[in-house]
């Protein structure tokens, strides 16, 4: 099987590519106060120690992230973090917009979360599983291993059967192998390995 890129995927990836270069590498790597307050522990692009949801001072993080997004509107990482804390605070409409824009800006963690929003039919999310498929495909290529696991799961369930831009089984298997290599030690890693191994078996 070959990886198929059809019109919708080409448009999405082109949008991601065009959105990325607007922010210089130096600016993108600068640690903001928003990073310090709201970085996700599992974000592969985080530049500060991650904060669990329960450890975040939401009013402070929202206020600071708004300031940092205004100062760096093309910084998809910071915009993702604004979307994250807005969602935790129950400000779903604004959170959805921020997450979508961060995903369109090429931020893998935002692409993963936005796909979750779509599949779980969160308020304001499009009711189109193919949107989740495109975002998880991009996030998987960006190193967000959870996106690969979710993609493979929904792919095997037939959720994406109506989509015309699916990844080939070989590509999904490559993402899952990367997830396996990143498995943590201990029971958490053990159960991840079992689950991912089962997904890979079912893809054959």
Residue ranges and their predicted role:
Residues 26-69:
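N-terminal leader/linker segments that initiate helical-solenoid repeat arrays
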Residues 30, 71-75, 104-108, 120-122, ...:
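Short helix-capping/linker turns of helical repeat alpha-solenoids
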